[in-house]
Curated annotation (Swiss-Prot):
ATP binds at N61, Y510, R606, H634. This is Polyphosphate kinase. Keywords: ATP-binding, Kinase, Magnesium, Metal-binding, Nucleotide-binding, Phosphoprotein, Repeat, Transferase. It comes from Thermosynechococcus vestitus (strain NIES-2133 / IAM M-273 / BP-1). One of its GO terms (cellular component) is polyphosphate kinase complex.
Length: 732
């Protein structure tokens, strides 16, 4: 008899990598990130005042989320846009999901602050108390403060047929007051804005502290106003009062390629922003339904837009407590260090008397110190890591020395965000006054920094700086400086290419990297990039730089697919990428293909991550962590194993569609072996973190790593601070 044939095994169905189930929604992923920020406020290992800071950061982040993301989703719904992202969730569904996810989180935040953090503060003699809990003497002091300081500033606004509902500014704190006319018995509504010219939390003087030894004792300003409402409405009965706050859309609607004058167009849009549509209403719990309904109707809001919360509103203002001189309740102070590579410059500088004003230092000083710095860069590439390394002693010094050095002919820089009293801008003004060619790209569309940047643009233009506002249709996000210097009869170009803004204030809080180099190819690339930004050049390729929106997407995909080829050929294949967010579908799909091919992938993503790790057959070999702590992780680092010949890159871009397609970005290769080793070690420290790292689970939640029993804590920030001190001390 013929033998029975064994049944043929059916080939597995190919996995559809475009299936929405393999992608997280970016709005919900962002909310997960902010939830990790809030966890720092709940974590008893976080110093007490730092816990208030994280409460404030969470609330401030959330304000921006509503002003931009929720406002954008609402606009899509109103415009009938049904387009969905890779996760397949339409805008209306996203708004519902945001509400469903967020309401319990903010409810718990307010409960925790009101019931638990306030008690913890009181235990440490920091009393944020209620007005009616004060002694008569303390109340009298605050009533006098109200009459002398606050009352003259207040403008109570009635709401009735003769007084239409007043304009409410975005994010302002207000009191809705229900008053009753005792003669007519008629109830009326009034609004009192809590002025922001005064401290939100009003401190009582030391002599009124009871008992003595109290660190701080104070009351929220709105409670002082509320207990003095009779002074604002004499002859009326105060029936009830409740705090409320609104959030308006802050998205600029600007067609940059159609604007004749971008600066004027943006100024006009900023003015319009004040009147953006209301996207959220926050009210104190217990507000009468009629009052709540009136506010909703006047703001044209639905139930989904209203958040009824316990206790204080606007917890952003808790930032103020970080100003208390109580170091025992804060993180140990960190002093950014001068990196060993820059200590030579410090030593050269110390040979001069620098006690006088910087403007009086002579040419011999500037020449000597600048020569030291530029010769240092000529000896080899240098990388600096902020805030471990001092921004003032490295990047700021580089720009300041270039501004004064007689041999420097030109300085070109991109400014995305800088500080209000920017020494960078001051140095650029000085460079122009010293007769150098100075070109500055000021990105006017840097969200919420538009007014600041307009101010600097005008100031720079006044002294003859060539100021440009970017490329039409694109936002310039690259962090680059080009210094052109005359040396021994030849021109040499020096560059700084970084991951963070040229902002001294955020440089002490944000973790960022910067490369100093005088490699000819990088200098040539940066010259051509600035020509694109300031002129009409259309550069299609670059020697070394990955530039968006020209080469970065294609080159990134090539690097991923090269690792796939190595894995398919049985060779080692590895990708490590650190950035703020990954949301681009094409890049995520390529990473899924890499995982399927056998490439080991570690992603260090602080914020949004639409990639779903750990899915069998799709992303088994992809691991994602997020590091949250005292510094904001902001650097972008990319490592590709390349079969034992690794390539490293740093730069300004995340793997998001906006960075790859709608922004001017620059990523530079790191080719110096010593710097490559340094980056590798720093990535390994982050991947080994068991204190600040959170692991992304396949269901979209995050699990915080904890040290095993008997294992020492390895927090990225504390490890790198200790390592920096050791490196600096070892170099002396």
């Amino acid at each position: 008899m013929p033998s029975a044939k064994s049944p043929r095994r059916k080939a597995p169905e190919p996995i559809d990598l475009d299936n929405p189930q393999y992608y997280f929604n970016r709005s919900l992923s962002w909310l997960e990130f902010n939830k990790r920020v809030l966890h720092e406020a709940y974590d008893p290992r976080t110093p007490l005042l730092e816990r208030l800071k994280f409460m404030a950061i969470f609330s401030s982040n959330l304000d921006e989320f509503f002003m931009v993301r929720v406002a954008g989703l609402k606009q899509q719904v109103e415009s009938g846009i049904l387009q969905v992202g890779a996760d397949g969730m339409p805008p209306a569904e996203q708004l519902q999901a945001v509400r469903q996810y967020l309401l319990p989180i903010v409810t718990e935040q307010h409960r925790y602050f009101d019931q638990e953090l306030r008690a913890l503060l009181a235990k440490e003699s920091i009393f944020l108390t209620r007005f009616n809990e004060l002694t008569p003497e303390q109340q009298a002091y605050l009533n006098d403060y109200f009459q002398a300081q606050v009352f003259p500033v207040l403008t109570p606004l009635a709401v009735d047929p003769a007084h239409p509902f007043p304009y409410i500014s975005s994010l302002s704190l207000n009191l809705a007051v229900l008053i009753r006319d005792p003669e007519s018995g008629q109830e009326r509504l009034a609004r009192v804005k809590v002025p922001n010219q005064f401290p939100r939390f009003v401190a009582l003087p030391q002599h009124l502290h009871s008992p003595q030894g109290v660190h701080w004792l104070g009351v929220p300003l709105e409670e002082i106003i509320a207990h003095n409402l009779s002074a604002l409405f004499p002859g009326m009965e105060i029936e009830a009062y409740f705090a409320f706050r609104i959030t308006r859309s802050a998205d600029l609607e600007l067609e940059t390629d159609k604007a004749d004058d971008l600066l004027i167009a943006i100024e006009q849009e900023i003015r319009k922003r004040r009147f953006g549509s209301v996207v959220r209403l926050e009210v104190q719990r217990g507000i009468p339904p009629l009052l709540r309904q009136t506010l909703m109707e006047e703001m044209d809001l639905e139930e989904i837009d209203v958040y009824e919360l316990e206790g204080l509103l606007c917890l952003n203002d808790l930032f103020a407590f970080m100003g208390l001189p109580l170091p025992q309740f804060k993180d140990p102070e960190w002093q950014p260090q001068v990196p060993p590579s820059f200590q030579r410059v410090e030593e050269r500088e110390s040979m001069f008397d620098t006690s006088s004003e910087i403007t009086t230092l002579g040419t011999d000083y500037w020449e000597a110190v600048a020569n030291e710095l530029f010769s240092l860069i000529r000896e080899g590439d240098i990388i600096v890591h902020h805030p471990y390394h001092s921004f003032a002693a490295t990047v700021q010094r580089f720009i300041t020395l270039a501004a004064h050095d007689p041999q420097v002919l030109a300085i070109k820089i991109t400014l995305y965000r800088t500080s209000g009293d920017s020494p960078i801008v001051s140095a650029l003004i000085k460079a122009a006054e010293n007769g150098k060619q100075v070109a500055v790209l000021v990105e006017l569309k840097a969200r919420f920094d538009e007014e600041n940047n307009i101010l600097w643009a005008r100031k720079l233009e006044k002294v003859g700086v060539h100021v440009v506002y970017g490329v039409p249709g694109l936002k310039t996000h690259t962090k680059t400086v080009l210094v052109v210097r005359q040396e021994a009869g030849q021109i040499r170009r020096y560059v700084h290419i970084g991951t963070g803004n040229y902002n001294p204030k955020t440089a002490s809080l944000y973790e960022d990297l910067g490369l100093f180099s005088c490699r000819e190819e990088l200098g040539a690339d940066l010259s051509e990039l600035f020509n694109v930004l300031t002129g009409y050049a259309r550069q299609r390729d670059y020697r070394k730089l990955l530039v968006a929106p020209v080469t970065m997407r294609d080159r990134t995909l090539q690097l991923i697919y090269r690792e796939i080829e190595h894995a398919r050929n049985g060779q080692p294949a590895r990708i490590i990428a650190k950035m703020n967010a990954i949301t681009d579908t094409q890049v995520i799909r390529a990473l899924y293909e890499a995982s399927q091919a056998g490439v080991d992938i570690d992603l260090i993503i602080r914020g949004m991550c639409c990639l779903r790790p750990g899915v069998p057959g799709v992303s088994d070999r992809i691991r994602v962590i997020s590091i949250i702590g005292r510094f904001l992780e902001h650097s972008r680092i990319f490592y590709f194993g390349n079969n034992g010949d690794p390539e490293y890159y740093i730069g300004s871009a995340d793997w998001r569609s906006r960075n790859l397609d709608r922004r001017v970005e620059a990523i530079t290769p790191i080719e110096d072996p010593a710097i490559q080793l340094e980056l590798k070690e720093r990535l390994e420290i982050m991947l080994a973190d068991n204190r600040q790292a959170w692991e992304l689970q396949p269901d979209g939640t995050y699990r915080q790593r904890q040290p095993a029993p008997g294992e020492a804590e390895r927090g990225t920030h504390s490890v790198l601070m200790a390592r920096t001190l050791k490196d600096v001390q070892g170099s002396h």
